[in-house]
């Protein structure tokens, strides 16, 4: 911070490493005493101040305004925020105040605010929420500041903030106490602003393309729409077991049957599975369905959506992710599963990739248990897919659509008319992570019923992620569903890319954590 013409600011505080350890309990006790005194005065938590300006807007609007202009045409402001820095110097003081948009400096003098208020201000603490009315001026070093005329304490902070040099050093504490992380870390605030910008971009472009946003149930009588283990709960009024949804797909396709030809939903999915840097049991997806389209149309549309989201959220389609360039402006690659394997593991021949027994033997070298329930009836396509996951998936840095998924792992996708055993399905990978999954939808009710039966057989054999038989969805298909394409985009993983975040918990405001001790 810089000082105004009338005063000389003191030197900056020393680094936290030079600061003696503080007794947090003692600080909290002292602040509670201050709050008790405020309560006695009847002014502990006033709620009659209304800001007229925000810090960032003022900084932008008056960035080039000189002091002479501000003196000639005074700008009255009313602004409030959290006190992040305080420097008391006799009859004049500085305070850096942070609101929801940014920071601005207050210049507070005893002559302007009065002796009583100034004396009280000296006892206010970092973290307190304060308000000011006054005029803008520029310090002799050019910093835009507020010459405070009226100063108030709006909310007393009882807990000390982390030191400004290190913030929250413990990563888990950042997730657990996100409210503190947001206070002290502009990077965290920018991450979640970018998340909002990306989601707003998706919504805007979906509306421009004629899609209607809808809301479908979060509690399902039958889990469906994905291969995943659900969370289970109980509906007391109906006395029935319910499942938190693992995907909205089957309900959205019911709407296609009903005549809404373009629908989408952005909402939570829940999967009772593991936690990792790219998996959270509660996550956000956007799923969309368009009648009279297929998976080729979906790939073009999805590519355009993601490119626009990057531009809207970050200002460019060329990003840096984990110190590597990520160019979303170029056309996305398209490879079959076998083409991707041979690109990154060229030692495999066409003949080997067509040999199921060879693939089973090869997968064991990667530690894959091919005797697990999901492999009991695995065909060639499934074995190829698992080999792809072991050899190629993590190396797909540039945006790449992987196509031609086998029918046996795609129970809701339309089968290819030209290649037996293959579906019109894709998955989009960027930086080695799956970002989207889409396909031409299966609209043959009899074929869908048969695939559900096979899924039930797999579940009975021990595959917990196999799908249930959804008789009502089959009934809906029997009324006739037009040719349709559908896709799901993982919002959290997309935001990871756009914000250079290595862990999915970095882009979820309140991620799941183990119970606090």
UniProtKB/Swiss-Prot annotation:
GO terms for biological process: lysyl-tRNA aminoacylation. It catalyses: tRNA(Lys) + L-lysine + ATP = L-lysyl-tRNA(Lys) + AMP + diphosphate. GO terms for molecular function: ATP binding; lysine-tRNA ligase activity; magnesium ion binding; tRNA binding. InterPro entries: Aa-tRNA-synt_II, aa-tRNA-synth_II, aa-tRNA-synth_II/BPL/LPL, Lys-tRNA-ligase_II, Lys-tRNA-ligase_II_N, Lys-tRNA-synth_II_C, NA-bd_OB-fold, NA-bd_OB_tRNA. Mg(2+) 1 binds at residues 427, 434. Residues 1-21 are annotated as: Disordered. Its cofactor is Mg(2+). Belongs to the class-II aminoacyl-tRNA synthetase family. This is Lysine--tRNA ligase. It comes from Cupriavidus taiwanensis (strain DSM 17343 / BCRC 17206 / CCUG 44338 / CIP 107171 / LMG 19424 / R1) (Ralstonia taiwanensis (strain LMG 19424)).
């Amino acid at each position: 911070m810089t000082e105004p013409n009338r005063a000389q600011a003191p030197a900056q505080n020393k680094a936290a490493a030079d600061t003696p350890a503080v007794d947090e309990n003692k600080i909290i006790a002292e602040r509670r005493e201050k709050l008790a005194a405020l309560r006695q005065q009847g002014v502990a938590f006033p709620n009659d101040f209304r800001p007229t300006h925000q810090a960032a807007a003022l900084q932008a609007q008056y960035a080039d305004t000189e002091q002479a202009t501000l003196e000639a045409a005074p700008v009255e402001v009313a602004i409030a925020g959290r006190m992040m820095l305080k420097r008391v110097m006799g009859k004049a003081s500085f305070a850096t105040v942070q609101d929801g948009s940014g920071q601005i400096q207050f210049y507070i003098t005893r002559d302007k605010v009065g002796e009583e208020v100034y004396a009280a201000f000296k006892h206010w603490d970092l973290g307190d929420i304060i308000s000011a009315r006054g005029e803008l001026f520029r310090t002799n070093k050019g910093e835009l500041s507020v010459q405070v005329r009226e100063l108030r304490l709006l909310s007393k902070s009882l807990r000390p903030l982390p030191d400004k040099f290190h913030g929250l050093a413990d990563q888990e504490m950042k997730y657990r106490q996100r409210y503190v992380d947001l206070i002290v870390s502009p990077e965290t605030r920018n991450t979640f602003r970018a998340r909002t910008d990306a989601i707003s971009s998706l919504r805007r472009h979906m509306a421009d393309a004629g899609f209607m946003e809808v809301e479908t149930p979060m509690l399902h009588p039958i889990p469906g729409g994905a291969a995943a283990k659900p969370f289970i709960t109980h509906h007391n009024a109906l006395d029935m077991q319910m499942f938190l949804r693992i995907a909205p797909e089957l309900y959205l396709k019911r709407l296609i049957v009903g005549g809404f030809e373009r629908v989408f939903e952005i909402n939570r999915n829940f999967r009772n599975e593991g936690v990792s840097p790219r998996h959270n049991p509660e996550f956000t997806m956007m799923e969309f369905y368009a009648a009279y389209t297929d998976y080729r149309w979906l790939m073009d549309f999805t590519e355009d959506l993601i490119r626009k989201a990057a531009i809207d959220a970050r200002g460019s389609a060329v990003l840096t992710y984990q110190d590597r360039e990520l160019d979303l402006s170029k056309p996305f690659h398209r490879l079959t599963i076998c083409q991707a394997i041979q690109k990154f593991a060229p030692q495999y021949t066409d003949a080997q990739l067509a040999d199921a027994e060879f693939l089973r033997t090869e997968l064991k070298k990667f530690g894959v248990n091919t005797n697990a329930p999901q492999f009991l009836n695995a065909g060639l396509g499934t074995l190829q897919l698992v080999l792809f996951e072991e050899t190629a998936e993590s190396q797909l840095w540039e945006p790449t659509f992987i196509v031609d998924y086998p029918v046996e792992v795609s129970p809701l996708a339309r089968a290819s008319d030209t290649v037996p055993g293959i579906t019109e399905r894709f998955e989009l990978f960027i930086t080695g992570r799956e970002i989207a999954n889409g396909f031409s939808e299966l609209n043959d009710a009899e074929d869908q019923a048969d695939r559900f039966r096979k899924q039930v057989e797999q579940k009975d054999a021990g595959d917990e992620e196999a799908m249930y038989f959804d008789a009502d969805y089959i009934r809906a298909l029997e009324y006739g569903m037009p040719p349709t394409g559908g896709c799901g985009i993982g919002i959290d993983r997309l935001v990871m890319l756009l914000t250079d975040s290595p862990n999915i918990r970095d882009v979820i405001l309140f991620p799941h954590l183990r119970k606090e001790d």
